[in-house]
A protein has these predicted regions:
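Short terminal hydrophobic/aromatic SLiMs and anchors at protein ends
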Residues: 8-9, 15
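Generic short N-terminal amphipathic or hydrophobic helices
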Residues: 9-10, 33
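The feature marks the mature, well-folded catalytic cores of soluble enzymes
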Residues: 19-296, 302-342
Length: 342
């Protein structure tokens, strides 16, 4: 009996690491089944859809090359597809050959860029989002009344740079509360504020509140000047975060609204990650996860999101996919007249 007991102890000692390893592998595996919840609305907004359609139709009607000032939208997959169709993307308007066909991106451009385009006799199609154009109009009206204009936004964002160009001597960009505290204006009774369109009411609330305390007579836009799509997608991701263990945001790292969606999800306490495509999915993220929420920034194509969903399905033995509908979007923006009649 002693020899059998001794043999048992030897076998147990040698096998224990293998049993522990097996248990650990089982614990670390993604769960057998998964629930996938897709936020709605998500992905392309009306401004992005319009901008991409302008480039596509211009290529169909006029052929290549079509030059585009800046990335038409902040998504490398969209840009690459259009590049393969004959679009040429440039950062400097002076790079576009004289007399060529050119398109302004959805983010808008400054009056200085428009003047250069005129001097170079470029045949321009304007894909600026109408909501961005509206903000430019607000800046012009404040400038005509000799107001100091506070632009709430990200200093280096291309949209902000275009808006500043409407009144460079009058516009001050602020991105945080400290910058509000440091503001110095020539006349505190003549101050107005405008916002970057990819920010939402939630994003700007604290800064607007601080501005109103600093400048009690400050004027600002109506609520409907805020981009509907940004607000809707943030509301959707908040609702999504309450129903899942992990949120995946499909979008580019240079997409302001995609990065903000990630931040909004994380502020709810849920685990959240941003990815550009299915190729970035990592099984390690899904250990012990029973439900995954998926959304996409305003410049992320639906087929890329569906690729992510397909990739997730492959990682689990079974899956249940459903939409979480927050609000119905029916917004569309008209194409330039020259493309509508062609």
């Amino acid at each position: 009996m002693k020899s059998l007991w001794f043999l048992y102890r030897i076998i147990r000692a040698k096998c224990k690491p293998y049993f522990l390893s097996l248990l650990q592998m089982t614990a670390n595996k993604p769960s057998e089944s998964i629930e996938l919840v897709l936020a709605s609305p998500r992905g392309f907004c009306a401004g992005v859809d319009r901008a991409i359609t302008i480039v596509e139709k211009a290529l169909q009607i006029y052929g290549s090359p079509i030059y585009v000032q800046h990335e038409i939208v902040h998504n490398k997959h969209v840009v690459q597809r259009l590049r393969e169709s004959g679009a040429i993307f440039v950062e400097n308007i002076n790079e576009i050959p004289l007399g060529s066909r050119a398109i302004y991106s959805a983010h808008g451009v400054s009056p200085a860029v428009r003047k250069i385009a005129e001097r170079r006799k470029l045949k321009v199609l304007d894909a600026t989002c109408p909501l961005v154009t509206k903000v430019h109009g607000e800046a012009q009206r404040y400038a005509q009344k000799d107001y100091t204009i506070i632009l709430i936004g990200h200093h280096k964002h291309v949209e902000v740079q275009g808006t500043v160009g409407e009144a460079p001597k009058r516009i001050i960009v602020v991105g945080n509360l400290e910058e509000v505290d440091n503001l110095v204006v020539p006349d505190e009774n003549k101050v107005g504020y405008i916002t970057q369109t990819t920010l939402s009411l939630d994003d700007t609330a604290e800064i607007i509140s601080a501005l109103k305390k600093r400048f009690p007579k400050i004027q600002g836009p109506a609520k409907n000047d805020i981009c509907y799509a940004t607000q809707n997608r943030q509301n959707a991701v908040k609702a999504l975060s309450k129903e899942v263990d992990l949120v995946l945001v499909v979008g580019a790292p240079n997409s302001s609204n995609s990065v903000r969606l990630l931040e909004v999800a994380r502020t709810t306490g849920v685990k959240a990650r941003r990815i550009e495509s299915e190729e970035e999915l990592n099984p390690e993220w899904f250990k012990g996860i029973r439900s995954i929420g998926v959304t996409a920034g305003a410049s992320a194509p639906e087929d890329i999101l569906q690729g992510v969903v397909s990739g997730l399905k492959k990682m689990f033995s079974s899956s249940n996919v459903r939409d979480l509908n927050i609000v119905q979007e029916n917004v569309t923006f008209a194409l330039p007249a020259v493309l509508r009649s062609a």
